[in-house]
Amino acid sequence: MTSFKRVPRTSGAFAILAGVSLLSACAVGPSTAVTPVTPSVAQTGDQAVPPAARTFFDSLTAARAADSASPAPQSMVSQGEPPQKPIGVPTTLQPDPAHNLSWLEIVRDSTLASLIRTAVNNNRDLRVAQARIREYRALHGAAVGPFFPQITANAAASRNKIALAGGAPIKYDAINATANVAWELDFWGRIRRGAQAANFDLLSHEEDARATELTLVSDVATEYLQLRELDESMRIAEATRAAGQAVLELARSRFAQGQISELDVRQFEAQVADPAARLAQFALQRRQQENALSLLLGEPPGSIPRGGPLQDVIQAVTVPDSLPGALIARRPDVMRAQRDMQASLARIGVAVANRLPTITVGGSYGSQRPEANKLFTPQGEIYSLQAGLSFPIFTGGRLLNEERAARARADEDKAQYQQTVLTALREASDALAGVRLGRDQLVAQQTQARALTIAASIAERRYASGVSSYLEVLSAEQSLFNAQLNLVAVEQQYLTATVQLYKALGGNWDGMGK
């Protein structure tokens, strides 16, 4: 029969174990604290326009404000179409790092807000990121488990026969049931460092999900703005085609009366064909844009609902010359890179601890008797306490090279973190400049479109009165058509710059699922 040596029960043994466990508070390896590398402010860079140009842009802004009180006369191109609504007064961006940049501050179109909610709820990439969070949360829980004693229960039954020297063999039955405890004392912090690394992995994937959501919201808003731009472009092309058709009919009437040549008529026909061709082009692009937006929504290709006009989709903002660098530091991609670096630093500690002795304690307690009905009686009590020390002496360089690899990975992640910060600064600077200078471009484009609208109206009246040639009308209408398309494109680019600014500063979508 297997024998177990009885040892005196003493509370001193547990006191010793508790004292040894306190020594595990130390942890080898570098600190996981990270010094932020973001500057105190994020600059927009040197202003791209000289002071004289700035004075000119300011004068255009004042002129546009005065023009709103006296609408320009309509040309034949603009007759019958809804008036062009200017972009509203921009709001001031909050530069306080404690301010939560919410997308709901700038998304004014309820239809766009609904589309974003649908995308957040349905997008497969976001579902993948959220599933990874659950995966790494479980892995973190598994990494924390070794902090605690591992308890197992065992039961066995056997029939034994042993031979004794000079005697008859002995047969006996043995039934035992024991509870076993094993505990690795985290003297060097190997388990602690592993749990830290798992926690940083979890935080990294949480930031990855935030980055996926941030990109998704930005992409939906950008695609929707482009869709609304195509709607406006189609409206302009159709209005221009209809107006050109009216002028063409007038030219044909004059040709029939012998007042103009066939060349004039052919020129007008070519003029009308241009917006007609562009109309078909815009229709194709609009269908492709709806399909792209449907993909972001996690839905099959189909029609996309529309809200208000392009100018009302996004709230325009004004920005200062610089913003606090803390706005950059809270971007999810920057936070993710920081967490990856911290996880690598923690794994250096794991690799270092693997080269040091491992201290374990354990024991078992149970009962062993020949008959099952006599288990757990005082006569069958068995128990033991053990302590072990394991020291790696020769591993063929495996542990040393694992430590070297961990340090190299930490250097890699540190460089990646620094590169991510530089990329974030560049994107923020580009977005700041895009918003600031996009406003100037928009004002100039609005001024051009208004001036050409007046010029086209004058040219049409002069041609109808017979005091000017068809070339004057053709030139004025073509210039107006191009200016109107450019204005819509600039409006879309300006509002998209606002979207990119919120993305560059790590804006949050607080309307998720609501």
What label would you give each PLM region?
Residues 191, 200, 207-323, 434, ...:
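Periplasmic alpha-helical coiled-coil/stalk elements that build and connect Gram-negative outer-membrane
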Residues 127-128, 144-145, 185-213, 263, ...:
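Sec/SRP-type N-terminal targeting helices
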Residues 255-259, 463-467, 504-508:
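A short glycine-centered flexible hinge/capping loop motif at secondary-structure junctions
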Residues 2-6, 10-121, 175, 199, ...:
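Terminal intrinsically disordered/low-complexity segments used for targeting and assembly
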Residues 175-183, 223, 323, 383-387:
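Hydrophobic, lipid-facing positions within transmembrane beta-strands of outer-membrane proteins
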Residues 28-30, 36, 159-165, 187-189, ...:
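Gram-negative outer-membrane beta-barrel proteins
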Residues 135, 157-161, 185, 297, ...:
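Transmembrane beta-strands of outer-membrane beta-barrel pores
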